[in-house]
Amino acid sequence: MRIGLFAVGRLKTGPEKDLAARYLDRFAKAGPAIGLELARMTEVAESRASNGETRKREEAVLLQKAHPDGGILILLDERGKALDSEAFAALLGTFRDQGKRDLTIAIGGADGLDPSLYDRADATICLGKMTWPHQLVRILIAEQLYRAVTILSGHPYHRV
């Protein structure tokens, strides 16, 4: 299953980008052995619209263009369901085992995600109830993708 990340906003060169890239590289190397591969990282500029609702709508259009037809859509949202690492790995494994070809994990902009996306989403999850800056969210989800691969493959990286 090909996994893509979609993010509103661009990571500037620096330690955050380096750390996210390190975990995505680990995921890209370990994932194919268990049927998971990194397909793409799509970054789009934040909308310049004058109000939040318009910005969210414009960003949702960009997400829909980047998301493969028939693919699984997971939204990251502070109001989403909190999963531990094992449950996140199980969710990815379930989608993979159902024969799903593409999965996109979406990180919204400062205004959040457009309400229309929630109806289309296959899952809405959170990385805790706190609000995180998008730079840190990318690091956290990149690490959790790598951790999910290690859980699904029985690698000792994940210890409880």
Curated annotation (Swiss-Prot):
It is found in: Cytoplasm. Pfam families: SPOUT_MTase. Keywords: Cytoplasm, Methyltransferase, rRNA processing, S-adenosyl-L-methionine, Transferase. Specifically methylates the pseudouridine at position 1915 (m3Psi1915) in 23S rRNA. It comes from Rhizobium rhizogenes (strain K84 / ATCC BAA-868). InterPro entries: Alpha/beta_knot_MTases (IPR029028), RlmH-like (IPR003742), tRNA_m1G_MTases_N (IPR029026). Its main location: cytoplasm. One of its GO terms (cellular component) is cytoplasm. GO terms for molecular function: rRNA (pseudouridine-N3-)-methyltransferase activity. HAMAP family: 23SrRNA_methyltr_H. It catalyses: pseudouridine(1915) in 23S rRNA + S-adenosyl-L-methionine = N(3)-methylpseudouridine(1915) in 23S rRNA + S-adenosyl-L-homocysteine + H(+). Transmembrane segments: none annotated. Homodimer. SUPFAM superfamilies: alpha/beta knot. Its EC number is 2.1.1.177. It is an enzyme of class 2 (transferase). Gene3D superfamilies: 3.40.1280.10. S-adenosyl-L-methionine binds at L76, G108, L127, G128, K129, M130, T131, W132. This is Ribosomal RNA large subunit methyltransferase H.
